[in-house]
């Protein structure tokens, strides 16, 4: 018996089923990586930063962190807020708030007992002293106070100080008034 069958042409390749969803994305990624590799570029392997679910599961499987510091250890709240402030560009405002809010820790209890900050605008810190003598003393200590502030919050936050003494008492009553004859001898 002979084969009377004619050799047939190879069967046409069956059409590929339509690819959808995640399979389509995978194929596109593989093609892009192959094209990059063919052109001699470095081929990325996706995220390796350790922020996804896989990295979290891998960390859980890793076990105890050991005696050294680890990124899983509790972090101070201040470090977190500083990172957020830097990330969002709030650092200058936070530094200004630190000078005004933590005045006692920044300059020391001695100075803080006799002077208080009243405002900070354009790098000029306004300080009100409780007496004229303390205002004079603070003016002489101005460079040391600026050094303490720079050490606490950084250079450039406070460039100079405007130190004022107490204001004189006023006998003015109400918003409308007539100029009087002066204070006269009211102290006996």
UniProtKB/Swiss-Prot annotation:
Q: Which Pfam families match?
A: DciA (PF05258)
**Ranges of compositional bias, category Low complexity:** 7-16
Disulphide connectivity of cysteines:
none
Domain of life here?
Bacteria
- Segments carrying the region annotation (Disordered) are 1-20, 31-78, 166-188
InterPro entries for the chain: DciA-like (IPR007922), UPF0232_actinobac (IPR023007)
**The family this protein is said to belong to:** Belongs to the UPF0232 family.
Q: HAMAP family recorded for this chain? A: UPF0232
Q: What is this protein called?
A: UPF0232 protein RHA1_ro03670
Q: What is the organism lineage in this UniProt record?
A: Bacteria, Bacillati, Actinomycetota, Actinomycetes, Mycobacteriales
